[in-house]
Amino acid sequence: MIKVINILSDTNIGGAGRLLVNYLRNFDRSKIEGKVILPKDSQLKPYIEAEGYEVIETEHGRDKSFDMKAMREIQAILKREKPDIVHTHSAFSGKLAAFLCGVPVRFYTRHSAFPQPKKLTTFPGKQLNGLINSTLATDIVAVAEAAKDNLTETGVPEKKITVIINGSEEVRRTTPDEQKALRSSLGIAEGDFVCGISARLEDYKGHSYLLESASEVLRTHPDTVFLIVGGGSQEEALKRQACELGIEKKVIFTGFVHDVAPYYNIIDLNLNCSWGTETSCLALSEGMSIGLPAIATTYGGNPYMITEGVNGYLVPEKDAHAMAEAILKVMDDREDFEKLKIGARKMYEEKFTAAVMTRQLEKLYEEAVNRRKKK
């Protein structure tokens, strides 16, 4: 039995947290046992506990990658728990604590991809960053080739990195009556075509460009609704933008929702407008699980997930006109739309299930532990 402690510093539910819950749900409990360290009052806690895992809370380090007090708390926990593996997710405090405690196997997952500052891609910053990461982590997981590229360009040795593409659980299907009721409650007419996006409302997710695209689409296709699922710091600004564009009656903001499944079930076309931090997008794979084709930007790991004309289309990032044209192309060619739906489901089954992802990580865990035992 391998004892694993996962560490996150997030208090909200982002991609890293959702990914961890998928791992926990799919681990082979005859091989893997573990606990999760979170900052106090994290929204992730009930979801992790629902999977049967204990959550250990720290008083410090809320939404901070590094916090000295949090690091000391984590050190005390690790000394008590004595795990075989510590696996950190955007939590430098945990990474450093695991090293200082002498935990034999220290995993770190890179969940994002974004332009790196010059000081980290040139001498001496590149060499120093590579040395720090190689010392603190024995094994590194990148959730997309784009994330791996981010790491190698900042000095992290390629041999340390394994790419495991994000997988997701199959979205729960709702009944036609449930779908009709939700559409009605949101004011969506029976014949409306629903374009949807599920993402935190942050600048780098590209919602402002989506609203510009929506304005263009609605000029010729007024029976279209844009469903924006999620909450975030840009919510009020985006609502103002929708009003300024005169499309507020055709744009629905749900705010943060605990269960996105009912919303996926009323979406016709899945959208991803990211221009920063995107790797392998869970919202895309979740949508594919119920046959939702997608229009996505070419940023980060999106090109690995979307194959042109098979399960969707790709457009340049920050290009509202290109996004609008792609949406219209799908809406106006229903035969192609039906083919894309079939392609989306097929691709999910072949590449993007949570079970496939988890088996890959379990194998890495076993190999890392066995490697350490031989030393």
Regions found by a protein language model. Name each.
Residues 1-375:
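Membrane-interface segments of envelope glycosyltransferases acting on lipid-linked substrates or membrane lipids
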